[in-house]
Amino acid sequence: INLWMKEYSSELRKIFGNRIWFVGLQGSYGRNEATEQSDIDAVVILDKVTLEDIKAYSALLDSLPYREKACGFISGKQELLNWEKSDLFQFYYDTLPIIGSLNSLKEYFTAADVRRAIRIGACNIYHGCMHNMVHEKSWEFLKGFYKSAAFTLQAAGFLQTGKYERRRKDLLNHLLPEDQAILLIGQTLKNTNLTERKEFERLSATLLSWASHWIVRC
C-alpha cells in the first residue's frame, strides 16, 4: 500500500499541482488492518472539483495497479468544510494524512456533533436491522450492520473517553461491556458463514437492542 500511495500521490501532483489541499488514506489500510480483500480508500481534497477534474481523476486511477480495489472520496475544500458535522468528525479522526493536514477541521465539530454521529449511526442500524428481520432475512445484510456498528462504536468510545481509537483491537479496551460484545460479534461474523435461523434471530435481536439503547441515550 505504501508503494501504491506513493505512485498515487505522485500522479496527483502531476495533474493537480498546488490545487491539492489534502491527500489521505481511510479504511482498513489506514487502520493497518487490511486483508487481501480490502479496498483502497484514498482521499483527495482539491481547491474545487469540476467535471474535467473528475474525469482526470478517474483516468488517473485507471492507470494505476489494483484499479478494482481503488475507491474512497474526492471533494472540493469548501464542500468539505461545510459538510455534515457528524460525518466530518469521523472523517477527521479516521483519515491518515499523506499530503497536508486536517487539523483545521477540529474547530468545525463539537460534542453535540459526536452525539449526532452516534444517534444517526444507531438509527440507521436499527432501521436496517428491523427491515432485514422482517423482509430480507439476510446474513450478509446482518454482517454489514455489525460492520457499521463498529464506526458508531468509535464515536461512542470517543464520547466516553475523549480518545478516538481507529483500530478495532484498541477500541475494544475503551468500550463498555455491552458495546464490546457488539464489536466482538462483528469481528466473529466477518469470517464466518452461518445459516442457522435461530442464531440469525438472536444476533439480530442483540444488535437491535443495542441500537435502541444508543438512540434513546443520545
Question: PLM features: what roles do these ranges have?
Answer:
Residues 41:
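N-terminal loops that bind phosphate or other acidic moieties
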Residues 1-18, 30-36, 47-218:
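Catalytic core of pol beta-like nucleotidyltransferases
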